[in-house]
Every structure is written in structure tokens, then in C-alpha cells.
A protein has these predicted regions:
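Extended redox/cofactor-interaction regions of prokaryotic respiratory oxidoreductases
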Residues: 1-122, 127-135, 218-461
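Hydrophobic alpha-helical scaffolding
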Residues: 67, 82-83, 138, 150-158, ...
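Short conserved micro-motifs at the rims of enzyme active sites and ligand-binding pockets
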Residues: 89-90, 116, 136-139, 156-157, ...
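Phosphate/diphosphate-binding loops
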Residues: 101-110, 151-170, 470-472
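Short Asp/Glu-rich motifs
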Residues: 115-116, 138, 176, 188
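Glycine/threonine-rich phosphate-binding loop and adjacent beta-strand/alpha-helix elements that clamp
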Residues: 124, 132-154, 165, 169, ...
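Short capping/connector residues at structural and topological boundaries
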Residues: 137, 143, 150-152, 157, ...
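Long, contiguous, secondary-structure-rich segments that constitute the structural scaffold
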Residues: 163-212, 300, 310-314, 319-328, ...
Length: 553
């Protein structure tokens, strides 16, 4: 998945995290453990080590078994709402698709994954509902949740995601464990119960107070919320911030209003304020990591303090503020594992943030670079900067896979590939573009894939605006696109948008789409020409800086 280093809500992958979620899901921890390979690999036990990231699935397929920190290379892939053309290294991706034993695409649209593989079998398309054909909660980037209603019944044979998941769980034999506290109507789990289960477990981020009932109340009374600060003025949700942006501490019954702005100590915790989390201990190398002389207003502790635990409540004399039921649940627990929410409730009643009050961490001692520093890209036209700003050494295993840095950067490709290539977004399209390029009004606005080239470079190459050109990346991937000659890019730099797909290295794949399902606009995927490179902390792919050559087609 996108964050393969943690269970939901940043609990991590240690045994305690699995035990927490086993309690939330009401399944036996040993049963969960028994579903994992118990072999110790370079990265450790698979259950407790980060998985292969979505950015590296290609290498998860193509690497030899003995090079991977798990039993075998990947044999099957689910592309669930995933745009493969938004990932780098297109030619290697096609090879990986061909090596897989099975591909499953779950999406309202066939997507590029359904047509670029060049396979004749082992590919399954599962039509998923759009947002208009299902109901439930969604979370926006400001951390607010919204409840949405179904507009129309699912078209054709499409199904909502949670029903598809349930049907898969049935086939795999763990549907009962998946839905132990979730009502299932026919084959469709009740979406409200799914959110309630999320609320029951995600204490770390305060995704616990946003019950379906509270979100529906917000939905019905949109008009009572301010467009300026999101807060309701009167009405049933008086004082709440719209969508109860997380952290919305405690249980729904505690009625925390949500936190519209993170790390604001000028507001009481009970009203959405907080300091920085005491996430990294209380001291390091003799330096106090807790806040000094700073705390959220109206709190009974006016200095730094660690994360709240049952023992901390006892030491402060606040333990008896818990109900008897809360005491039974909180004994031996902390603010993020107490399923009653009592520890959070009592801390907040005393004006304290449950996660503690610490200093912001500027020196990240767990990262390869403890403070940000420039490292020259693996592929660069500035070879003079490589010695001054070298990349990292290769990693034997990172997120289960060998990850290359220095061994790539040591090779000088700049004579053959003299132009820096970057990629990015357009206003008209989103992501891999499958949905937006299938909308006639948007498709009319951007009908062709292109590369932006500086006028000086165009003159040096011998091309004009509107010419068809080949853009070849430093690993040999090529795209056939129109040249847009413009000073918007600097001399020696080219730009391509990444929203296009359906043409692969000059080959039009239109006929491979199911009848009537091809987008209005097809084009080369920019990432066919992009190259290897991954951030060592997150394994995020390098899409912004590689090198290329451009020539007339």
C-alpha cells in the first residue's frame, strides 16, 4: 500500500501494534500471526518489517527471489483505483506485468493497466462504483470528514469497494474475521459499521470522535457552518468544526469539536488546540525533548509533558476521574491503546493533549540525512556537482528490496542525454487521467500529449512548435509527442505532464480497451521515459529530475 511501514493510523508494525488492532478487530493475535511467514529475512520477520511500497512493485516482481526480504517475488497484483501511468519506468513495468501470474484491475474505468500489459490471459477487470453510486464517509486533505449519499444505484454490474473486499474475503476464508462487528446485508457490509470500527481503533490520530451520526448531522446542517473558520454557529452542531477534522479526540459521546489547525497552543485542547506530540521520547543526548515554558492554554500542566498512560494519570492524581468501566479498560494501557477513550477524556478535561507536549523535531536522527541536504540526482547533466553532492550508497535491502543509488550515479549518461526532464500536472486532468480524459468537456481542452521545450533548445535540435518528436529517457524508454516550444521552461530543461496513457512507445492501444471504454483522449505516458530513483525514507519515486534527449520523429 501507500504506507507499507505501518498498520492503520501510524501504529507501526511492532507486536504491540498488531495486538492493538487484534483487539479492535476482535480476532485472535495468534491467528493473525499464523497467517504470516515466520522466516527471518534481512529486514526481519515479514509481519514486523515494512512491505514493498506501491512505487516499487515492479522490482517486487522482477527481482530474483533470493534478493528480496520475503519468501518469493510478487506473483499477482491488484490495481485498486491505481493509475500505473503515474509510476516511473514504464518499459520495466510492462515486463513486470508480463511476468505476473495474475493481474486484477478494480476501477470504474479499465485504466492503462488493462491495456499496456500485452498479455492474452490472467487479467481480470472488476468494475467498481463511482462516488455517485455508493455512500459513506470521505476525508479531505484538511482532515475534515464528510458523509456522502448515493445519487444513483450502481450501473451495470459495478459494485462498491467494500462489497468487493467482502467477496474476496469470502473466497480467502476470512470474511467472518473481517466483519466480526460489522453488519453484512447480503454481500455488502454496512458502511456505517465500517466507520465505527475505524473510530474504535484510530486513537493515535484522533479519528475516533467522527461517528456516522455526527457526520450525518453535519451534512444536514451545512448552512450553520462558517466559511471563514469552519465552525458551526448555533444549530445542532453548535461549536463543532465542519467535518470534525482529526484529531477529534475521544469517543463520539465526548463530543470534541475537531481540530481545524494543528499545533495551535493558543486554543484549549478541548476546543481543538494542542502542542507538538511527544513522539520521540523525553530526552536525547542530554537534551530535553519536551516543551519548555510552553503548553496549550487553559491546561493544568504549564510545561512539557510526555504521552499519557494509566500510570501518568495515577501519578497526577487523576485516575479516579475515570469511571469504573474506563478504569478496567485503561489499566496497563496508554492514550493510544485504551479502547474506552477514558485516558484521552481525562487528559483533555484537565486541559492536556493526550499525546503529550514536546518540542518540534528539526533534527531527524532516524533519517539517512538528519537535516535536509542537497544530493545530486542519480541522472544529471551537472557531473561537476556529483562529487560535491553525492547520492547515498546502495542499500542491500530497503522496504524488502535492493535499492540502488551510487552504482547508478557513477555512470555518466549526460553526453547522450543532455536535457533535464521534469514532469508534473495540468489543470484539466487528474492523476493518471483515466476519468478526466473520459469526460468530453475536459478532453476538449487538452487533446494531445506534449513536451515543453525551450526555444533555444528547439533551435539547437532543429524542431519547431507543433512538430512531432521523440523524447527518450536515460534508461531507453521513449515517447512520441508534440513539441510545445515555450520559454516557460529554462534552457536545458523539458517538461511533460503525466496524465496521459493509451499509447506506448508509439503504439496506439485503443483497440485493447473493452468496447466503448476507451478515453476520448489517448497519449503517451510521460513515465515511459522517466527513470529509476527513490527517496530512502518513503521510497517515493523520482519524477521531477532525470535526463533525456529530444529528436524529430
Amino acid at each position: 500500500g501507500l504506507d507499507s511501514s505501518s498498520l492503520p493510523a501510524y501504529y507501526g508494525l511492532a507486536e504491540g501494534a498488531w495486538q492493538h488492532w487484534a483487539r479492535v478487530w476482535d480476532v485472535d493475535y495468534e491467528w493473525l500471526k499464523g497467517r504470516f511467514d515466520q522466516t527471518e529475512y534481512h529486514d526481519g520477520l515479514p509481519m514486523n518489517s515494512s512491505g514493498i511500497t506501491v512505487s516499487r512493485w515492479v522490482d517486487g516482481v522482477l527481482e530474483e527471489d533470493e534478493a528480496i526480504s520475503q519468501r518469493t517475488a510478487l506473483k499477482a497484483m491488484f490495481y485498486w483505483g491505481h493509475a500505473v501511468n503515474s509510476q516511473t519506468r514504464g518499459p520495466e513495468m510492462r515486463r513486470a506485468m508480463q511476468k505476473l501470474e495474475m493481474m486484477v484491475i478494480v476501477d470504474p474505468y479499465p485504466t492503462v493497466a488493462a491495456v499496456m500489459h500485452d498479455r492474452t490471459d490472467g487479467v481480470y477487470l472488476l468494475p467498481a462504483c463511482t462516488q455517485f453510486e455508493t455512500t459513506g464517509s470521505v476525508t479531505a486533505t484538511n482532515r475534515s470528514l464528510q458523509w456522502r449519499d448515493k445519487v444513483i444505484e450502481p450501473l451495470f454490474e459495478s459494485k462498491p469497494d467494500h462489497e468487493i473486499m467482502y467477496l474476496l474475503a469470502e473466497k480467502f476464508g476470512f470474511a467472518e474475521e473481517l466483519t466480526r462487528h460489522i453488519q453484512v446485508n447480503g454481500k455488502e457490509p454496512l458502511i456505517e459499521d465500517i466507520l465505527r470500527e475505524i473510530n474504535r481503533g484510530t486513537w493515535t490520530i484522533g479519528y475516533t470522535g467522527q461517528s456516522p451520526e455526527r457526520l450525518k448531522e453535519h451534512q444536514k446542517h451545512w448552512h450553520t457552518f462558517s466559511f471563514e473558520d469552519l465552525r458551526a454557529e448555533g444549530g445542532p452542531a453548535d461549536g463543532d468544526y465542519y467535518g470534525l477534522p482529526w484529531p477529534c479526540w475521544g469517543t463520539p459521546e465526548f463530543a470534541h469539536p475537531g481540530s481545524p489547525n494543528l499545533y495551535d497552543p493558543s486554543v484549549p485542547v478541548k476546543e481543538g488546540g494542542m502542542g507538538f506530540r511527544a513522539r520521540f521520547g523525553i530526552e536525547r543526548n542530554g537534551v530535553n525533548l519536551l516543551a519548555e515554558g510552553s503548553a496549550p492554554v487553559a491546561g493544568e500542566l504549564d510545561d512539557g509533558y510526555p504521552e499519557f498512560t494509566d500510570q501518568m494519570l495515577k501519578d497526577l492524581g487523576w485516575w479516579d476521574d475515570l469511571t469504573d468501566e474506563e478504569k478496567a479498560a485503561a489499566e496497563g494501557e496508554n492514550w493510544k491503546t485504551d479502547l474506552s477513550g477514558g485516558i484521552q477524556r481525562v487528559a483533555i478535561e484537565h486541559g492536556c493533549a493526550p499525546y503529550g507536549n514536546a518540542k518540534a523535531r528539526a533534527v531527524v536522527w532516524t533519517f539517512p540525512d538528519q537535516v535536509p541536504k542537497h544530493r545530486e540526482p542519480l541522472y544529471t547533466t551537472r557531473r561537476d556537482l556529483v562529487e560535491q553532492f553525492p547520492t547515498w550508497d546502495d542499500f542491500r535491502s530497503l522496504f524488502r528490496l535492493p535499492t540502488l543509488y551510487r552504482s547508478i550515479q557513477e555512470n555518466d549518461n549526460s553526453d547522450r542525454y543532455p536535457i533535464i526532464l521534469t514532469s508534473g500536472r495540468l489543470v484539466e486532468y487528474e492523476g493518471g487521467g483515466e476519468e478526466t480524459r473520459s469526460m468530453s468537456w475536459l478532453a476538449e481542452l487538452q487533446q494531445e500529449m506534449f513536451v515543453e521545450v525551450n526555444p533555444a533548445d528547439a533551435n539547437d535540435i532543429g524542431i519547431r512548435d507543433g512538430d512531432t518528436v521523440w523524447v527518450e529517457g536515460a534508461e531507453g524508454g521513449r515517447v512520441r509527442v508534440k513539441a510545445l516550444v515555450t520559454p516557460r521552461v529554462g534552457r536545458g530543461v523539458a517538461f511533460m505532464p503525466f496524465h496521459f496513457g493509451g499509447i506506448f512507445q508509439g503504439e496506439n492501444l485503443h483497440d485493447r480497451y473493452p468496447e466503448g471504454a476507451a478515453p476520448y483522449v489517448l497519449g503517451e505516458a510521460a513515465n515511459t521515459a522517466t527513470t529509476y530513483g527513490y527517496d530512502p525514507v518513503t521510497l517515493m519515486q523520482e519524477t521531477k529530475c532525470t535526463i533525456c534527449r529530444i529528436e524529430r520523429a
